[in-house]
């Protein structure tokens, strides 16, 4: 029996990484918000790898922090090992990754939600939506509670109509033995949304006491770890270590011998999994001649003996998992605490969404995270924040926040999803950005804090601190450009030691810093007037000076991008009857309904010739 359970401005379905950011954003922007989760013990859960960040993903976390999100702060309060990845490459691809204490992270996020003003956290399964005049007006729980709302964010993760598969055993379940979310996916399909099914998987967990780490390679954290959040003042500490081991030919032989028992290859699993996080059986099938694959053995926390075997994701039967694990160095006697499994779940075709992440068909309905076809905690958090902010802005009668590709990785992620769509779980990578030298993780505050400040999620004090930081960067660059250093035996000895040419007469400090062999700190002994600057300022100075030419070129590309994005397309345009467009282009443009010529040009199946037709049409139909 249904009953009236109350009224809220916004309901968020799901309290994973997307739902948390959506709920906090709405509440912090002054809207009465309710966040629903199937299980209160699963708030902020990490059902797969117990880590935050990684290549490309670390950029997302920094960007989210610059906008006013929570993930970076929670990570700094709960992570136990920090590593900066790709330090052997340029600064554009430097990405922070941190091992998290999984339970501490969950508890931290749950506490944050519980203490947030304007936000209620409730355990309930939402099984349907109510629409009034085609717009979201209520959500209904499995127990019959009806909550009147003005907007709703679906952040259902891998729970929606979920099915877990291990070997020939398949059953309805969410991740980690939680309930699956039932009813909602079927209703969304009946409302006209294009739904599909994706798959992901997770490796086994083993008992720390049963593994032999002496047979593995030690993977320590950075000597001087750096935090995720721009507001974290206390340097983080490394409190744990990880280990590296490998599969081998014996492991591969067992997997090959059980090929017909793999749900991925015997027809039990038909949905599409993530390309960049394949199962071990997929790796063996795809790379049959590769003699071994890396496996990282990572702690799930400081107060548990569970160890996560990154790289050993599988849906093979449990007995096969046991057999293959015992062939791996250091895991010969490992006790498996949780077997690996695959999980299928329902999600929406993201081309159903606007760049604000609002549904094109159902006003007031927003999607975020794996519901939108992405994979990963960080991708989910970024989308949850954008969906929550835009739900709040719409209800407040304010202009939406649309993050463009030229703004950063969150904008790139969303543009890829809503413009190009995806046929597999989407993962962010640095290679997806055309402007990655501009979109470094170190300058996310400069790029995005003005937006966070404008929407009210970055305080005046935070904003002014960032402005002061970049004033200091600019002042130091001016000083270095104007400061010369005379030739000396000590200077030239240092230059030769760094395998770069000595100077004759004198040289400007700025010219020396631009040499690839030298860094800002190398020149400190020859720069007595140097001011005492924080490490983040010194880093920004060095990057800007070394890459000035490349940065200038990418900024010109961004200006061209802005011109194309500024050519807006009317919402009422009739693509199906537009003469000159190819049939495929008509169909794609009508389906996606891009907001600008720039967005139209990125749609698969729309050619430069089709864009020329659009430009002619715009010229002929000027108001």
State the predicted function of each range.
Residues 4-18:
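Beta1/beta-strand and adjacent pyrophosphate-binding region of the FAD-binding site
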Residues 39, 186-322, 419-492, 496-506, ...:
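An anion/pyrophosphate-binding glycine-rich loop and adjacent beta-alpha core
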Residues 308-374, 402-415, 534-588, 593:
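A glycine-rich dinucleotide-binding beta-alpha-beta segment and adjacent secondary-structure elements
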